Design a protein with these regions (language model features):
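N-terminal signal peptide c-region/cleavage motif recognized by signal peptidases
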Residues: 16-19, 23-24
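Short solvent-exposed beta->alpha transition segments
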Residues: 30, 37-41, 45, 55-102
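Acidic, low-complexity intrinsically disordered segments
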Residues: 26-28, 33, 83, 97, ...
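Bacterial N-terminal signal peptides that target proteins for export
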Residues: 1-13
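Exposed beta-sheet edge and beta->alpha loop/turn motif
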Residues: 97-148
Length: 148
């Protein structure tokens, strides 16, 4: 990513961290490789459930606050279709390097759409008391990187 793209991503992550108020245990400033693998699996599994139209399963990958906010699988799927359609329709995806910024764990996912538009989905992750990672929020931002 270019320095400008990194700065834009950091600004978006800062906005996301401020916008999402949740109680979570402190996170170390770096995570082990197996933690990033677990995080990416949660994101992949939720996207598969979303693409299959399985709102109930997709909600299981969301943090408790997100599940409470949307209440039902139908409401959750409606929100995804209306605001996060790129997650469902991207023709290609690529995980970028994740980051821990203060207590926010952020996993970027590059999305390439059918028209070669490139977006970045910034997932904020939350580790649950049982040790599992859940999605606490997602912000989709334009990318300055072109499709290859």
């Amino acid at each position: 990513m270019s320095p400008r793209a990194i700065a834009a991503s950091i600004a978006a992550v800062a906005w996301l961290a401020c916008a999402l108020a949740f109680a979570a245990p402190p996170i170390p400033q770096s995570l082990a490789a197996q933690e990033w693998t677990a995080i990416r699996k949660v994101i992949d599994d939720q996207r598969e459930a979303l693409k299959a139209g399985d709102g109930a399963k997709a909600m299981t990958y969301a943090a408790p606050g997100i599940r409470e906010q949307f209440g039902t699988p139908d409401n959750f799927m409606r929100m995804v279709r209306e605001g996060y359609g790129a997650l469902l329709t991207a023709r290609r995806t690529q995980f970028l390097e994740g980051a821990v910024i203060e207590d926010a764990v952020v996993q970027p996912l590059r999305l390439v759409l059918a028209d070669d538009t490139v977006l970045v989905a910034l997932y904020q992750m939350q580790k649950q008391p049982n040790g599992q990672w859940r999605i606490a929020g997602c912000l989709i931002a334009p990318s300055t990187v072109q499709s290859t």
